[in-house]
């Protein structure tokens, strides 16, 4: 397992040519993406890259073709930008781009399919059930130990998520999640500590521990609250952090991801780790976790952005 990051970008910004940063879009994560894109664009321009931004709307493909960039930095979050669709368009246009390819992006965006892949290779993820309009709410909840997390299968940033402990709450949570996605799942609730591990160019960066006074690490805790605590160093022993980083790399590879991303975990009270999801285009805002982990590895934000973009030179 590799956990010591060696910078790969040689500083030759001329080799990057004209770069287009894609952000915004039309998903429920648009506001976060606008912030990520603005930060990335500013960092690239500060680093001497000929970088330009595009808020992705209905005419985005024509605008990308007209601009004819040498490479693209994808800072789109959620459906339409993180789910393989934009990646497939860029493949068709033969334009190099940051992050995972269209197949891995589509798989990682689907929490149900991702969990199935992880289970098939022996990686541990919380027990779960798919929900439909006429599910037996009590039976589902009983099968998961009486408490669950309800999630839209294709949303990020904890959008549409709920914690439930009664059949009535489960039904209401399903209806809330179904507003965002036709595919909804409920996971067994793991009580314990939450961690995340960023992966950059095959290297697992230092883990981050998350503490919030909310019921769970929801949208407000991620992007608005000033009371959320980010622990880096994460508070685990060296051995347990190494175990967590190893699982993150295995989970990342199992889905076929490459370049950069982030893997989220829960740790139960017995010390066992459970995989929650993988993010192929993590946030790059002032509250974001990948820049925090990179900083712990001696990589400042502007350097991190260049390291991610330099993946397109390979």
Swiss-Prot record:
Catalytically driven reaction(s): 2 D-alanine + ATP = D-alanyl-D-alanine + ADP + phosphate + H(+)
Subcellular location: Cytoplasm
Presence of the UniProt keyword Cell division in the record: no
Keywords: ATP-binding, Cell shape, Cell wall biogenesis/degradation, Cytoplasm, Ligase, Magnesium, Manganese, Metal-binding, Nucleotide-binding, Peptidoglycan synthesis
Entries under Gene3D superfamilies matching the protein: 3.40.50.20, ATP-grasp fold, A domain, ATP-grasp fold, B domain
Keyword match Oxidoreductase: no
GO BP terms in the entry: cell wall organization; peptidoglycan biosynthetic process; regulation of cell shape
One GO cellular component term noted in the UniProt record for this chain: cytosol
Binding-site residues for Mg(2+) 2, renumbered to this chain: 277, 279
GO terms for MF: ATP binding; D-alanine-D-alanine ligase activity; metal ion binding
Family the entry assigns: Belongs to the D-alanine--D-alanine ligase family.
Function: Cell wall formation.
This protein's name: D-alanine--D-alanine ligase
Gene: ddl
């Amino acid at each position: 397992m590799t956990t010591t990051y060696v910078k790969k970008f040689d500083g030759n910004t001329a080799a990057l040519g004209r770069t287009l940063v894609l952000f915004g879009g039309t998903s429920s994560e648009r506001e976060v993406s606008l912030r990520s894109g603005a930060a990335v664009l500013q960092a690239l321009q500060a680093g001497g890259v000929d970088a330009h931004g595009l808020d992705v709307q209905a005419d985005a493909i024509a605008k990308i073709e007209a601009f004819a960039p040498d490479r693209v930095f994808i800072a789109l979050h959620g459906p339409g930008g993180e789910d393989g669709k934009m990646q497939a368009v860029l493949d068709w246009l033969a334009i190099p781009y940051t992050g995972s390819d269209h197949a891995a992006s589509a798989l990682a965006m689907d929490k149900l399919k991702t969990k199935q892949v992880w289970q098939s290779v022996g990686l541990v993820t919380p027990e779960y059930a798919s929900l439909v309009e006429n599910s037996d709410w009590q039976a589902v909840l009983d099968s998961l130990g009486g408490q669950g997390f309800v999630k839209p299968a294709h949303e990020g940033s904890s959008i549409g998520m709920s914690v439930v402990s009664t059949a009535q709450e489960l039904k209401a949570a399903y209806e809330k999640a179904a507003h965002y996605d036709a595919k909804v799942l409920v996971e067994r609730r793991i009580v314990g500590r939450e961690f995340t591990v960023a992966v950059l160019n095959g290297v697992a960066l230092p883990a981050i521990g998350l503490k919030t006074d909310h019921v769970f690490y929801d949208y407000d805790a991620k992007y608005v609250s000033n009371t959320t605590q980010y622990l880096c160093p994460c508070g685990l022993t060296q051995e347990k952090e190494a175990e967590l980083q190893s699982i993150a790399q295995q989970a990342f590879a199992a889905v076929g991801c490459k370049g950069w991303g982030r893997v989220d975990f829960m740790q139960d009270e017995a010390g066992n780790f459970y995989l929650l999801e993988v993010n192929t285009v993590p946030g790059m805002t002032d509250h974001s976790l990948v820049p925090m982990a990179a900083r712990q590895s001696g990589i400042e934000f502007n350097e991190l952005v260049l390291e991610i973009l330099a993946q397109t030179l390979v």
